[in-house]
Regions:
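Glycine-rich phosphate-binding loops that contact phosphosugars or nucleotide phosphates
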Residues: 304-446, 450-453, 533-579, 597, ...
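Glycine-rich oxoanion-binding loops at beta->alpha junctions
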Residues: 72-93, 285-300, 324-360, 366, ...
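Generic C-terminus detector
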Residues: 241, 556, 569-571, 581-622
Length: 622
């Protein structure tokens, strides 16, 4: 949530900053701003409410701001309403123009995160003569830096360190000091930040896509660390002011993967990239026909000792966990608990000491998931992270990491990230079953080969997208939609429902089909859309029966089922068929039509598919 960028080098900064912010729009925002400095001249600050295009227009696409050092920000309101006044950057001076224009301030900065004790700090600063023009916690932090900088006559190192010790909460902070032209100072705690290095130029961003166009060599700044950035160099420090040695990491992602490549929206592009994401993820662990977790550092001895698995995640990643629970418990005969990270971290619950906590996060920065993992580690449990971003906070702190190879995912609504996570958990299920002696060599090979057929079968489903597009246009004005299924199909329904509601703004809910009669069926009325997922042969007739109850009350029925279940045509009003794969893995196929449905409904309604209202791609605050 929020996005930060920074640049110091030889080129004009503002166009680079605007380009970087455009690559972070998926994180969600309500306003944006830039601060650019030309040599020893004072910083120029420009801010705008609303879309990034408003800021671009104000600055003539950045050409109106001269200077080779600058910082930028897209804001998601947490303290103070969305407005130009509350937009970042903020300044340390007592400014009457909401911090815009040429600023006579010692410190200019932007911040991503939440400062929990900002009220206390604000009262302190008021007593020392500071006044405030905004309602934000960020202005408080900038003025706290200024306070230490001036009062103790400190340099940026000590002023930054004292500020970091004093504040409570999360932050990724960028600062420019009037007395230090060409330098950007950054600090981090629990909010994402990467630093990119190229020839004579240095970049800062919340996420990789913002700088991928310019460099692949990045530094990861650790918790409670700060850094001085100059053109082409970065120097890191701990809270004591001692310098820390770091090495760069090369980002392997293709720069073009962060572009639309001819698709109207990132979401559709990423739907089409799912076969590759799954192939790449499978190929990273399937070698010579067997699953090899050597790179994850997960040994057979460790697998044998785990008696309980906890899967902890948020949003779509939690849906992956729900589906994986069915597969792992049936295959590997290990009890699995699936927990929402935002609940798990606050529960006083007994945890099995020889349990394994699997945390799932596409970004590797999800605040609640990160906090839940830390809690599990404090209690002595082993942790395995399934993440997509190399070097992310969760990846760095987990005991073991299974990287999904989905590449950058820009659309807020996850598709390929979800699918890569799901196949990763399927691999874990198969390997655990094999190591525990619960499946034969023949079954093991069969399951692996079935997983390897999924990419081609997804491509076949995508060939039928026009029928789903037609159906989506027909129901684009629906007010309520219900998804029903059992077992793995229920998990698919959870994800399908979320896809529809988050990008089309239609109220939708997913229910275990057997629960309809326990209250939900009272909501069924004429022409309400009920979507059933029916891929599990043992549960097929039960779910059909539940759907018929809905039809008898006037519902319009859509069914998603396997090729071969052609009697479905006589029972529901619209049927989507998907290829067959082993039923443990059917969720990877059944979810595709539901992704397409959500996408096409949103398009039919003329909505912003990639950046739905009120949502952020990476939820990095609690």
């Amino acid at each position: 949530m929020c996005g930060i960028v920074g640049f110091t080098g030889n080129h004009q900064a503002a166009p680079i900053l605007l380009d970087g912010l455009s690559k972070l729009e998926y994180r969600g925002y309500d306003s944006a701003g830039l601060a650019v400095r030309d040599g020893e001249h004072l910083s120029q600050v420009v801010k705008a409410k609303g879309r990034l295009s408003n800021l671009s227009e104000k600055t003539d696409s950045g050409k109106a701001l001269k200077g080779t050092c600058g910082i930028g920000h897209t804001r998601w309101a947490t303290h103070g309403e969305p407005s130009q006044v509350n937009a970042h950057p903020h300044v340390s001076g007592n400014c009457e123009k909401s911090g815009s224009g040429t600023v006579e301030s010692e410190v200019v900065g932007v911040h991503n995160g939440i400062i929990e004790n900002y009220t206390e700090l604000k009262e302190k600063l008021l007593k020392h003569g500071y006044t405030f023009y905004s309602d934000t916690d960020t202005e408080v932090v900038i003025k706290l830096v200024d306070y230490y900088y001036k009062k103790y006559n400190l340099g940026p190192i000590d002023a930054s360190a004292k500020t970091m010790v004093r504040v409570r909460g999360s932050y990724a902070l960028e600062l420019m000091f009037k007395d230090y032209p060409g330098e950007i100072w950054v600090a981090r705690k629990d909010s994402p930040m990467i630093i990119g290095i190229a020839d004579g130029e240095t970049y800062v961003a919340s996420d990789v896509p913002a700088i991928l166009k310019y460099t692949r060599n990045v530094y990861y700044i650790g918790n409670l660390e700060f850094a001085k950035l100059t053109p082409g160099e970065a120097h890191f420090y701990d809270l004591n002011g001692d310098e820390i040695e770091k090495e760069t990491t090369e980002i392997k992602w293709d720069a073009e993967a962060a572009e639309k490549a001819g698709f109207e929206h990132f979401m559709m592009k990423e739907i089409y990239e799912q076969p590759k994401a799954i192939r790449d993820t499978l190929n990273s662990v399937v070698k010579d026909g067997v699953i090899d977790f050597t790179d994850i550092d997960l040994t057979e001895e460790e697998i044998k000792k785990y008696s309980q698995i906890y899967i902890v995640a948020c949003g779509s990643a939690w849906h992956v966990g729900v589906e994986a629970q069915y597969v792992i418990e049936e295959m590997a005969q290990i009890p699995v608990r699936v927990e929402l990270a935002s609940e798990f971290r606050y529960r006083e619950m007994p945890l099995v000491k020889d349990g394994l906590v699997i945390v799932i996060s596409q970004s590797g920065e999800t605040a609640d998931t990160l906090a839940a993992m830390r809690m599990a580690k404090e209690k002595g449990l082993a942790t395995l992270a399934v993440v997509n971003v190399i070097g992310s906070s969760i990846a760095r702190e987990a005991d073991k990491v299974f990287y999904t190879l989905a590449g950058p995912e820009i659309s807020v609504a996850t598709t390929k990230g979800y699918s890569a996570q799901l196949v990763a958990l399927d691999c874990i299920a198969v390997q655990f079953a094999k190591v525990k002696g619960l499946i034969t060599d023949e079954q093991y090979s069969y399951y692996i080969s079935e997983l390897q057929t999924i990419p081609d079968k997804i491509e076949k489903i995508l060939q039928d997208k026009e029928r789903i597009q037609w159906f989506a246009a027909k129901y684009a004005n629906a007010h309520d939609v219900f998804f029903v299924g059992r077992g793995v199909d229920y998990a698919v329904c959870l994800e399908g429902s979320l896809k529809l509601k988050e990008i089309s703004y239609i109220h939708s809910e997913a229910y275990a089909a057997g629960e309809l009669k326990h209250g939900t069926i009272s909501l069924i009325e004429d022409n309400i859309l009920v979507i059933g997922v029916l891929t599990q042969s043992k549960l097929y007739e039960k779910t059909v029966s539940n759907m018929m109850e809905c039809k008898s009350r006037g519902a319009y029925l859509m069914g998603v089922t396997n090729y071969g279940n052609y009697e479905m045509e006589d029972k529901v009003d619209f049927t989507v068929y998907v290829p067959k794969v082993d039923e443990h893995f059917m969720g990877s196929l059944a979810v595709i039509p539901l992704q397409l449905l959500g996408y096409y409904v949103s398009v039919a309604k003329g909505l912003d598919v990639d950046k739905p209202r009120n949502l952020a791609k990476s939820v990095t605050v609690e």
